[in-house]
Regions:
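Amphipathic, Lys/Arg-enriched alpha-helical "gate/interface" segment within cytosolic domains
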Residues: 1-127
Length: 127
């Protein structure tokens, strides 16, 4: 699987784009890399785009990767994840697992809605 991480310091968020197929180990690696980038850049908002994913990830792997990332650090960036309509069930599951582990996360089917929620109350936007 391919992915890109882009830091938007102007608006104060990190964008992660997933492409192709994925598995448990790759999900964990990407999440850990994103956390490192967020901490290094002192950014507390993460926007995750999974519209480019193909295939599927098992519910067990979604549970394991989300749990691992939520519990791996005290730093829990606010995370908005958005995808296609056919991914809604999985994204809602990720949201539930994350919220149950005190991770501020919300799933969306629309990028603009995800970004609006993510940046709501962001000091950089109100300066």
């Amino acid at each position: 699987m391919a992915f890109k991480i882009k830091v938007n310091t102007e608006e104060g968020y990190i964008l992660i784009r997933h492409y192709g197929e994925t598995d448990l180990n790759e999900n964990i690696q990407i999440g850990e890399k994103a956390l490192q980038v967020a901490i290094k850049n002192r950014i507390k908002n993460v926007l995750v785009d999974v519209t480019g994913l193909t295939g599927g990830v098992s519910i067990t792997d979604l549970f394991a990767s989300t749990s691992h990332l939520a519990e791996s650090t005290a730093e829990k960036p606010k995370t908005a994840i958005y995808g296609r309509q056919d991914q809604q069930r999985e994204l809602e599951f990720i949201e539930t697992v994350g919220l149950n582990r005190s991770m501020p996360i919300k799933s969306f089917m629309d990028r603009n809605a995800a970004l609006a929620w993510l940046l709501m109350g962001n000091k950089r936007n109100s300066d």
